[in-house]
Amino acid sequence: MKVVLFCGGLGTRLGELTEDVPKPLVKIGYRPILWHLMKYYAHYGHKDFILCLGYKADKIKDYFLNYNEYISNDFTMSEGGRNIELMQSDIADWRITFVDTGLRANIGQRLKAVEKHLAGEEMFLANYADGLTNLPLPRIIDFFQESGKVGCFLCVKPPHSFHVVKLQENGLIDSIEYVRDTDTMINGGFFVFRKSIFDFMKPGEELVVEPFQRLIEEHQLIGYQYPDWWCMDTFKEHQVLTDMYNEGKAPWEVWRARETDPAPTQR
């Protein structure tokens, strides 16, 4: 399946990290989060990518046009560096389509802009490109295919330690608890769609607002629950991911693990 990656946002909550590069190019270790995400999909055989570009689109194009294989691969050097033999390649079998979808476009507009590049695809994958997981990808795809629905997305626990408060009209507090201790789930940004998703979209609409509401009304939208998910929406979250990587604890790197299928989780 083709993979649509939304790479056009401003990433303002990452502060100085996105002054010179777009959010998808913010690095975790030696490589940007976009690379980690693409490696995840490629590990499961999905290597045909469509990048929906916007803010600093030139930076993303330049990154891949001048891709340096030696940073993340073993190689043998001889003749004083004139001859270099790579032991493996990251992206040799990837196909990447770069599409400028506008600086201020929302997710729905960006998806609509690449519809023609999905011609002939009965289903496709999509992603916000700002989060990582170790979810065995075939699970959510199989779950979606068996459902016969139009759309599916990963449902995860909120990553923050906010408190959920219930109160009465007079202001009296009934309860207070950590949001992660409640049944609250959020959209993890990993999607599977049938091509008919475009029938539910109108010009200018945000994907998860009007189109998703139509899917809900027609019982065509489902969610897949999974516990392991790491977002990179803030400077603090980026630091958490960087620390995990530096400590050798990067569970989203399923391409490195010997056993990539964690214990089943409730759907």
Per-range role (PLM):
Residues 1-67, 98:
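N-terminal glycine-rich phosphate-binding loop and ensuing alpha1 helix
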Residues 3-5, 51, 126, 151-154, ...:
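Structural beta-sheet core signal
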Residues 122-125, 132-145, 157-160, 172-267:
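Catalytic-core segments of class I nucleotidyltransferases/pyrophosphorylases
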Residues 59-169:
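Conserved beta-loop-beta/alpha segment of the NTase-like Rossmann-fold superfamily
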Residues 43, 116, 214-217:
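Solvent-exposed polar/charged
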Residues 25, 164-167, 223:
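A structural signal for short hydrophobic beta-strand segments in well-ordered beta-sheet cores
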Residues 33-36, 109-113, 211:
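Well-ordered alpha-helical segments embedded in enzymatic catalytic cores
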